[in-house]
Amino acid sequence: MMMISLQRRLALMAAATAVMALAGCATQGPSQQALPPIVFVHGNGDTAALWQTTAWRFESNGWPRERLHAIDVPYPLNRDDDTKAQPGRTSAAEHMAYLKAEVDKVLKATGARKVVLMGNSRGGNAIRNYIQNGGGEQTVSHAILGGTPNHGVWAIPGFREGSEFAGTGPFLKGLNAPKNAAGDEVTGPVQWMTVRSDNNDKFAQPDGLWIGQKGTPTNVTAAGPELKGATNVVIPRIDHRETSFSPAAFAAAYQFITGKAPAATAIASEARVAISGKVTGLGVDPLDAKTGNFSNNLPLPGAQLEVYATDPATGARSGNALLRTTVAADGQWGPLVVPPGAPLEFAIAAPGSATTHISRSGFPSSSSIVHLRAERIADADKTAASVVTMTRPRGYLDPARDQMLFDGVPPVGVPAGAGAASAKIKPEGPQRSVAAQFNGERVVGQTWPAANGHLVFLELTY
């Protein structure tokens, strides 16, 4: 079921295995009868939904679904200055407090004494803060950080040092202070692992291009995510998000926790697939468009959701809606039993938002974190005939690395170096099919008129 080129998959797996063998990172793991709960912590501006494929891979290797928990931070974006309140943003302390509360819930629900924490990017900041400053050294057995900017996205004295991403700022300097005579940067007795790219993580670059400071040295290298005292894994060519969501990153995490390689990184199919999730919006208040267009993970009550099976070749709807529902106060929808492997279209309509059409590949397995966001049309797009976005939430698009087509041609405006996770086109003419292809995965949808308030997203799963 892996929707990724065979050549690249084998290269990533071989690289991860080789690096892990050299690092000697096979830790003493639990028995199959006592697999620990895993709490997944998403990155900046992201959602629990990004952990969907990772959870599937753990389940495919025998991990109980009820012992896999992905948190969903209500306001997932960091503050520009961590010391100053900012509407719709979460401070490092608030982030840590939310994680602590979620860990407590998981411990109570499972009866376990400790959890494994697995975080991507900013999620690793919260994990480190919780273990060092929030009592997590007593409740966490393993901490796995993918692409976390542990020494900053930049480390420029005097430059935005109030940000939690500043390597010279008080937040990261406090976390990185030596913990023992050896100078370890990690807090014991927790076992730590970091996963990074060799040079393809946009937030671990020596030049300030991605922070709007092209030509300025960041004083950060590709090794920035590593921590002294941790097992540090390097996987060639993966991007910032793939440090957590790629099959190779999963394999590294599984072996670190259990002491043995996973039986498979492919996702096992279920005979009966049931999906559910949450519908969210944008801004400080998703019901008030005037409060901003930035991401949140707050429920969007009153939104109308329709789900359709679609034709794999054309993206056209196949028959009547599988689900037509009004979202309740908690934002939750489902569970909905869907045809295993059948591609789907999700259509969300809500006041103040565009009617958002999301086309996705078929679901091989059940998931309760199929979260959906109602988007808004950008001012620059309001006169377009239609607006279609190819998006890859669990990784970036890299024309120097990946095989991609968007509406039959390579995506326009996507730079080499895994710096973008989406591409947009504005097709003219009547309704028609549009396809997005990425390393073997193909998602097909239909155009819808932007003038009538519609947006289309072709969302890649892998």
Q: Predicted segment positions?
A:
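N-terminal non-catalytic accessory region
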Residues: 26-118, 122-158, 261-274, 280-462
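Bacterial N-terminal signal peptides that target proteins for export
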Residues: 2-14
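Helical cap/lid subdomain of alpha/beta-hydrolase-fold lipid enzymes
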Residues: 47-49, 83-88, 92-113, 125, ...
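C-terminal motif of bacterial Sec signal peptides marking the signal peptidase cleavage site
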Residues: 21-24
